Amino acid sequence: MPLNRTLSMSSLPGLEDWEDEFDLENAVLFEVAWEVANKVGGIYTVLQTKAKVTGDEWGANYFLVGPYTEQGVRTQVELLEAPTPALKRTLDSMNSKGCKVYFGRWLIEGGPLVVLLDVGASAWALERWKGELWDTCNIGVPWYDREANDAVLFGFLTTWFLGEFLAQSEEKLHVVAHFHEWLAGIGLCLCRARRLPVATIFTTHATLLGRYLCAGAVDFYNNLENFNVDKEAGERQIYHRYCMERAAAHCAHVFTTVSQITAIEAQYLLKRKPDIVTPNGLNVKKFSAMHEFQNLHAQSKARIQEFVRGHFYGHLDFNLDKTLYFFIAGRYEFSNKGADVFLEALARLNYLLRVNGSEQTVVAFFIMPARTNNFNVETLKGQAVRKQLWDTANTVKEKFGRKLYESLLVGSLPDMNKMLDKEDFTMMKRAIFATQRQSFPPVCTHNMLDDSSDPILTTIRRIGLFNSSADRVKVIFHPEFLSSTSPLLPVDYEEFVRGCHLGVFPSYYEPWGYTPAECTVMGIPSISTNLSGFGCFMEEHIADPSAYGIYILDRRFRSLDDSCSQLTSFLYSFCQQSRRQRIIQRNRTERLSDLLDWKYLGRYYMSARHMALSKAFPEHFTYEPNEADAAQGYRYPRPASVPPSPSLSRHSSPHQSEDEEDPRNGPLEEDGERYDEDEEAAKDRRNIRAPEWPRRASCTSSTSGSKRNSVDTATSSSLSTPSEPLSPTSSLGEERN
């Protein structure tokens, strides 16, 4: 099946204000997800970062509904009394009938109100509700699948809550219920089955069957049309889960996915074309470092260098000033996340650097949590040796400084032969002896429980990257999430990313991809693929992604070997960049953070909610998408300072000046003039055209005023703003032809 990329009709900056005429005074939004105040995966990040923008739009009429977990409530939620009489009556009614429902405020930016349903306390009704689910939806749930049983309990409790809230409300409300993922989907199906007056939205962040198929080494994207979905789900013993997901997708008034690539996947696996694509954003303010992100990179890199000094003690025969730090991070899905491709490319990169006599060294980190039982003793010893050497050096330095001070105080130059005594030399020799090491530095920082069958370690043994002195590429596998309290690498994830030079995410299955997005907003170049939602989004909106530090690896139309070769080419060309070029590229990368801000991507969610309201309450709301001229489409321009040929960006002299290497002064251009990133950004923005907003929404009820939200007012700036929700309904049809 051909998977052609199509541009959005109106994309990006310079947009006029969105004249949103929806009156939300009598509308209430409930966002339902298993990961509300309950960190499990990426949906938690979506909800957490989007909460402020959604709260600005809906105000006190915005609520999140999730499961009650003791850990989550203790650390993330402040329990409160219900703020309205209708809500208080709803909670009291449910609690009096054997449920346990809690209300509070989620302690994140925006402070959204949350309703937490205790799933375990309602287990007494599980069998009855499973019977009702079978009678209503013909979906049977086996007793042994605890996660699916929890989904049934959560779905029935959610529907009970929404129905009770509508019954207890004295005025007629227009309720929107937005359900995320299959774990919350049963509630949506029951809302429709019980004919509750609720506008429903279902968002799938990744299809169940797609994730299972890709993990099984299937040629997924070339066979989407050919899968017997019922058979495939049954063979993997997830048929009941698949039915939950598919039923929710078909029952929803509006069905959305997080990326164009997932929209195509949903069309064939869930048998419904998504109405809108709702890309995931980030709270860019959280990562904002003003103009100091270059300095933050240097500070964070210094923390990583300290770890490297300890880890490679005894084999530290490479120059840390000429060392680049690459990393891959995420869930430990060896093939889906592209760790197999990355390792193969590192082996080829190692060969290229060695045969070309490069002085550059690459340290590649794999941050993927796996089953371990403790830290590696050699790794701990390395950090202890490093700290001991540092203490020894400081002791000698203090003694040397004191003698130098005394000598200068009396007006004479010191005798250098007497500055250090025999004890000092003995101390230093002991320190040098402590750095002697017979074995190679360890590849893994922890003791793995299944060392012999671990896919990363098995591949490393095959390709022979053992951190030997001859290798220009070193590998460090850190099978645990990063923490600032770790005795090995005491940095949190954000600080670690800032200190690296390149994030590598060659995923085969990645519906969106928050890791490269986080790199972008922190000004760190990254490699993504055209099979990830993020990669497709950036490829669609940027004329020359690589010039901005966004490298898009082709895994759609290339074989695995060709993809490895292309990734090797990306890595090798990055290693050939000068420090000056990397500084300029980081500036450009950081500028793209505007593309990923919820202030702009939040419009897609707003459009989905307005579409749902118009479908559920057509007598009060209308939603009329207008076709836009394809010529209005816009892609972020190529940077004005990028030369037409890479050869023109090389130095005429093999040596760089100190001015060029100082990020505080800014790098020099080829003619010797100072490079000004703000001036370059202004040039880009002058090229931006302002396409007309392609659709209008309105409210036909007899209310006087309309509620302008902060998301709309933010568009008066000239930052990069997506103009319309990407509707895959037409483009998916084109891709089938």
Curated annotation (Swiss-Prot):
Q: Which residues carry this modification: Phosphoserine?
A: S8, S11, S412, S641, S645, S649, S652, S653, S657, S698, S710, S727, S731
Post-translational modification Phosphothreonine, affected residues: T700, T721
Q: Where does this protein come from, organism-wise?
A: Pongo abelii (Sumatran orangutan)
UniProt name for this protein: Glycogen [starch] synthase, muscle
For this protein, the Enzyme Commission number is 2.4.1.11
Q: Where does UDP bind?
A: K39, R331, T515
Of which family is this protein a member? Belongs to the glycosyltransferase 3 family.
Acidic residues bias locations? 658-681
